[in-house]
């Protein structure tokens, strides 16, 4: 939904439930805000999963910002945090990306870091990617 009174603002909300097994119900709720002003876009999202078993309950929160330096170059930063109701370890992720486009060619790179993957304090990971794409 994009309210007319605030140009560049988009908001969204959704909810639903799933019965995974007989008598086991998961309630999911998600909401987001995105605001674009000129060449800057900022986004925020929250998700919540409620369940009778705390091991199935998850809270998720994310924030991101991107900046179009020019028509050809964009840089962005994102971070998120997930909490599991049955676990003290919080999964934290962050990433930086940049892209350059010229004609039909795009060169893009990302660096991501995730701590406590799957809520396991001994499971941290990093990832890097460089992508070159051509459109014909």
Residue locations for each model-derived region?
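Outer-membrane beta-barrel proteins
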Residues: 1-136
